[in-house]
Amino acid sequence: MIHFTKMHGLGNDFMVVDGVTQNVFFSPEQIRRLADRNFGIGFDQLLLVEPPYDPDLDFHYRIFNADGSEVEQCGNGARCFARFVRNKGLTQKHKIKVSTSAGKMTLRLERDGGVTVNMGVPILDPAQIPFKAKKFEKTYLLQSAQQTFLCGAVSMGNPHVVLEVDDITQAPVADVGAQLTRHERFPKGVNVGFMQVVAPDHIKLRVYERGAAETLACGSGACAAAVVGQLQGKLGSRVRVDLPGGSLTINWEGEGKPLWMTGPAQQVYDGQIQL
């Protein structure tokens, strides 16, 4: 029997499993079955908490999409992870150092129940995103299905492409998102963000996530949109990002500097399941 906790960050929901005190393994098939909202638990991603690989860190954790694929980063998941390890008594710290396959992060639990995540320095080099382009540009041309899109590309530990739209409610998220998420210029696939700029400190955003379709919120997508908007001269260093599930605050002082994301993390229930 495996004990788990259902959590969400702005409606982006997770099955969180303690792999520190439990011996657990999930196959891609098991994850797909558990993620099914009709016949399983239902979630966007599974978070597996593990002991640290580095003695200077507190934990390592792994992130799996609903389709069973393992991914590098998840901003909303990072906040839920931090709240989970504190709630379950796995740590008493307010400042938690962790690693994922994308690298190291620092998480800070706030007094109001929110969590601030140091998401690291945004990766702009196309080769490291990875994105097939000759050199870094603030705006790229991306062609798909006889359409041409103006976009920005960045990695927050996972690849993102961001398109600006006039009206977020009319954005072709499902159609264009499905086209671009597997675009040949992104060898590992890509998360697709649709951004409406409201003011220099305020955007609205919808994200088609790689391996999960559109979700209510995407933390790393919010970070990517803030970066692209600032690089293109449309946004300042502090931005409120409104997603379908709620709002995040992003702080970024520019190229070469780490980006900070602040937002909520909520526990829904504890459960146990036989695999």
Swiss-Prot record:
Q: Where is this site: Could be important to modulate the pK values of the two catalytic cysteine residues?
A: H160, E209
Q: What are the binding positions for substrate in this chain?
A: N12, Q45, N65, G75, N76, N158, N191, E209, R210, G219, S220
GO terms for MF: diaminopimelate epimerase activity
Domain of life, per the record? Bacteria
Where along the chain is the active site annotated? Answer: C74 (proton donor), C218 (proton acceptor)
What is one term from the GO cellular component aspect held by the record? cytosol
The pathway noted for it is: Amino-acid biosynthesis; L-lysine biosynthesis via DAP pathway; DL-2,6-diaminopimelate from LL-2,6-diaminopimelate: step 1/1
SUPFAM superfamilies xrefs: Diaminopimelate epimerase-like (SSF54506)
Keywords in alphabetical order, please.
Amino-acid biosynthesis, Cytoplasm, Isomerase, Lysine biosynthesis
EC number(s) recorded for this UniProt protein: 5.1.1.7
* InterPro entries noted in UniProt: DAP_epimerase_AS, DAP_epimerase_DapF
Please classify the protein's predominant subcellular localization into one broad category.
Answer: cytoplasm
Swiss-Prot/TrEMBL catalytic activity: (2S,6S)-2,6-diaminopimelate = meso-2,6-diaminopimelate
- Family affiliation: Belongs to the diaminopimelate epimerase family.
Q: What does this protein do?
A: Catalyzes the stereoinversion of LL-2,6-diaminopimelate (L,L-DAP) to meso-diaminopimelate (meso-DAP), a precursor of L-lysine and an essential component of the bacterial peptidoglycan.
The entry's protein name is: Diaminopimelate epimerase
Q: Which species does this protein come from?
A: Shewanella amazonensis (strain ATCC BAA-1098 / SB2B)
